[in-house]
UniProtKB/Swiss-Prot annotation:
Protein's UniProt name: Heat stress transcription factor A-2b
Source taxonomy: Eukaryota, Viridiplantae, Streptophyta, Embryophyta, Tracheophyta
Primary localization class, coarse: cytoplasm
Native source species: Oryza sativa subsp. japonica (Rice)
Coiled coil (residue ranges): 165-252
Motif (AHA): 328-337
Length: 372
């Protein structure tokens, strides 16, 4: 029995136009005629396929078994990494032989993927679509960005994937900056409080030194003039009597009957000589330089104060405290003003002054002298 393959006859018939027909006959007599056109390769036969990174990523996302860690989004034009930890520890070693999630994101950035949602790991590319695997060949690896304005505008509302790693670092730096600013403000407040305390302490020290100097000058003046202390005590007693008289007349009611005051002035004298002791005339004629408050008090009470009780000027009344004490202004005026004829009438030996200065040396701000 003959082999059927040997019965095939190939005939070529030439035509004037240079074309030809190829006829192939089989045992059943059928013939196949093909145009005499040179064969061409299939479209895309020699084109390079999509990069392995894209194909592996597509397979990983399209796999229904990995939906717990990564899956397509609801719009099917992006994919979401739901569990970055499981994605890095389980899926990346299986598909890419490493477990570095940051490296995977950087690879996505080089192929033009963008982070869609800043609050989750959702990535998108216009040619990375669900059910359209053939579009992966259109995704090309990007060249290094030239940082031009056109590239920045092309990003649109998306966020660059490569910047994801800096977000946490930026947040941490912002928190550190806020803490440092709060610490700086606190230190500045403490510095201001310290300066205020130092200023108050300096003022107190200066006041103490000034009082010590005034005390030394006062004691030196007493040593020069022994009568000065007696005169000062007598003036102090006169002031106290004057204050007592004024305070009692202020407390006395106008409709109260006449009484004898502390300075010995009787109401009977006022009744016998009303013209002589008229309050207004007595103040104008007998008293010169009386403070207005003492003058009003005497007139309101309807009584009369002897002129010798008012032998104190307004400035001295202001220097007397509420309890009859003398303030700093009194001491300054007392030490600055001179007593006429005191130094000539009561000379003091210079040696006594030196002894006093040595004994009172401990009052100075520098501490006690070496002689003590």
């Amino acid at each position: 029995m003959d082999d059927p393959m040997l019965n095939a006859v190939k005939e070529e018939e030439s035509h004037g136009d240079g074309g030809g027909l190829e006829v192939v006959a089989g045992e059943d007599g059928a013939a196949a005629v093909a145009a005499g056109v040179a064969p061409r390769p299939m479209e895309g036969l020699h084109d390079a396929g999509p990069p392995p990174f894209l194909t592996k990523t597509y397979d990983m996302v399209d796999d229904a078994g990995t939906d717990a860690a990564v899956s397509w989004s609801a719009t099917s034009n992006s994919f979401v990494v739901w569990d970055p930890h499981a994605f890095a520890t389980v899926l990346l070693p299986r598909f890419f032989k490493h477990n570095n999630f940051s490296s995977f994101v950087r690879q996505l950035n080089t192929y033009g993927f963008r982070k869609v949602d800043p609050d989750r790991w959702e990535f998108a590319n216009e040619n990375f679509l669900r059910g359209q695997r053939h579009l992966l060949k259109n995704i090309k690896r990007r060249k290094p960005p030239s940082h031009t304005a056109s590239n920045q505008q092309s990003l649109g509302p998306y966020l660059e994937v490569g910047h994801f790693g800096y977000d946490a670092e930026i947040d941490r730096l912002k928190r550190d900056k806020q803490l440092l600013m709060a610490e700086v403000v606190k230190l500045r407040q403490e510095q201001q409080n310290t300066k205020a305390n130092l200023k108050a302490m300096e003022d107190r020290l200066q006041g103490t030194e000034q009082r010590q100097q005034q005390m030394m000058a006062f004691l030196a003046r007493v040593m020069k003039n022994p009568e000065f202390l007696k005169q000062l005590m007598s003036q102090n007693e006169m002031r106290k009597e004057l204050q007592d008289a004024i305070s009692k007349k202020r407390r006395r009611r106008i409709d109260q009957g006449p009484e004898v005051d502390d300075v010995g002035t009787s109401s009977s004298i006022e009744q016998e000589s009303p013209a002589l002791f008229d309050p207004q005339e007595s103040v104008e004629f007998l008293i010169d330089g009386i403070p207005s408050d003492l003058e009003n008090s005497a007139m309101d009470a309807g009584g009369l104060v002897e002129p010798q009780d008012f032998d104190v000027g307004a400035s001295e009344q202001q220097q007397i405290g509420p309890q009859g004490e003398l303030n700093d202004n009194f001491w300054e005026e007392l030490l600055n003003e001179g007593l006429v004829g005191e130094e000539n009438d009561n000379p003091v030996v210079e040696d006594d002054m030196n002894v006093l200065s040595e004994k009172m040396g401990y009052l100075n701000s520098n501490g006690p002298t070496a002689g003590e």
